[in-house]
C-alpha cells in the first residue's frame, strides 16, 4: 500500500521558501511526518528504530526531522500521520559545559573539557519550543482525520501548550534514572494490545498527569522492585488511545533507547498502534 522508502530529512527543503511559493507542498511527501530527537534523545536511534518497526515492517513511509519549526500547518498538510518522540525543550545557549548527554564523552570517563582559547562563559538555559500556532496546527490536523503517534517523552511538550496537551491527553511530571521495569497490558481487549504479552525493559519510566477517561488506558508501567519516583509510587500510565475528532491518537511511554524500541512485544504494540490510528486492520 505504501512505498518502502524513508528520507531522513527531505523536509529540510521545506524550510527554504526559494524552492517553491508553497514550501509545504514542494516535495512528494511520505505517509508520516516524524519530529524526533532532542538533547537527551539522539535522533539517530529513533530514526533507525522506527524505520525498522514502522517503515520496513509495515511499509509506512516516514519523513524524519529534528527541526521543531517544521511542525506547522503547512508542513502537516498532505501527511496522513504525525509521529513525535522528543521533549519540549531547546537549549539555545548550549549546555553550560555539561556534556553528560554526549554518550562518547561519558563512555571515555568524562575527561576534563579543555579549550584553548577558552570558551565564553554562557549560562545554560532551556526554553519551550512549541508556539501556540504549532499546538493549534497539531490539534486541527488530528481533528480533521490525521493519525497521531506520540512516544516516550513527548508528554513533556504538553507543558508548553494547552492545545497540544488536549490532543495528547497528558503532561509530563518526571522520571527516575534509567532502571528496569515491567510494561503490563491492562486492557487485553484493545486492538492495540492484540497478541501482546507483558514485557520488561530497561528504560526511563516516565510519569505524567493523565487527563482523559481511564477507559482509554491500555498499558501500565510497574517497578516490581517497589522503587518509586517522588510521591508518584511505583506505577504510571504506560499507554492510551482514543478517537479525536475525525482522527485518532495513541501514546506509549517506552522509548529511551533502541533496545526499548526493538523489544519484540513493543514492536507488536507499535505495529498495532500504527494500524489502529490509521484505521487499518489490526
Model-based region annotation:
Residues 25-81, 85-88, 104-105:
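Aromatic-Pro/Gly-enriched surface loop or interdomain linker
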Residues 2-3, 9-26:
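N-terminal export signals
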Residues 43, 72, 128-131, 233:
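A conditional alpha-helix N-cap/helix-loop micro-motif detector
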Residues 29-30, 56, 60, 67, ...:
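Extracellular ligand-binding/catalytic regions of CAZymes and related secreted enzymes
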Amino acid at each position: 500500500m505504501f512505498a518502502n522508502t524513508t528520507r531522513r530529512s527531505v523536509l529540510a527543503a521545506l524550510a527554504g521558501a526559494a524552492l517553491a511559493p508553497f514550501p509545504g507542498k514542494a516535495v512528494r511527501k511520505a505517509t508520516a511526518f516524524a519530529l524526533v530527537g532532542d538533547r537527551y534523545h539522539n535522533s539517530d536511534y529513533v530514526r533507525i528504530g522506527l524505520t525498522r518497526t514502522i517503515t520496513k515492517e509495515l511499509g509506512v513511509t516516514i519523513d524524519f526531522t529534528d527541526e521543531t519549526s517544521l511542525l506547522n500547518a503547512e508542513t502537516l498538510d498532505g501527511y496522513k500521520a504525525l509521529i513525535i518522540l522528543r521533549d519540549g525543550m531547546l537549549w539555545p545557549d548550549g549546555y553550560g559545559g555539561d556534556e553528560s548527554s554526549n554518550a562518547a564523552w561519558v563512555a571515555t570517563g568524562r575527561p576534563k573539557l579543555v579549550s584553548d582559547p577558552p570558551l565564553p562563559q554562557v549560562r545554560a538555559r532551556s526554553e519551550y519550543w512549541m508556539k501556540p500556532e504549532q499546538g493549534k496546527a497539531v490539534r486541527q490536523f488530528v481533528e480533521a482525520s490525521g493519525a497521531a503517534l506520540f512516544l516516550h517523552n513527548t508528554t513533556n511538550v504538553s507543558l508548553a501548550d494547552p492545545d497540544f496537551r488536549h490532543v495528547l491527553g497528558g503532561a509530563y511530571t518526571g522520571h527516575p534514572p534509567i532502571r528496569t521495569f515491567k510494561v503490563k497490558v491492562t486492557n487485553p481487549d484493545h486492538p492495540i494490545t492484540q497478541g501482546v504479552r507483558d514485557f520488561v525493559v530497561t528504560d526511563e519510566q516516565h510519569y505524567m498527569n493523565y487527563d482523559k477517561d481511564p477507559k482509554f488506558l491500555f498499558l501500565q508501567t510497574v517497578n516490581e522492585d517497589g522503587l518509586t519516583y517522588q510521591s508518584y509510587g511505583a506505577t504510571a500510565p504506560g499507554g492510551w488511545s482514543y478517537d479525536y475528532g475525525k482522527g485518532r491518537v495513541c501514546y506509549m511511554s517506552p522509548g529511551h533507547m533502541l533496545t526499548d524500541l526493538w523489544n519484540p512485544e513493543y514492536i507488536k504494540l507499535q505495529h498495532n498502534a500504527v494500524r489502529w490510528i490509521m484505521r487499518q486492520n489490526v
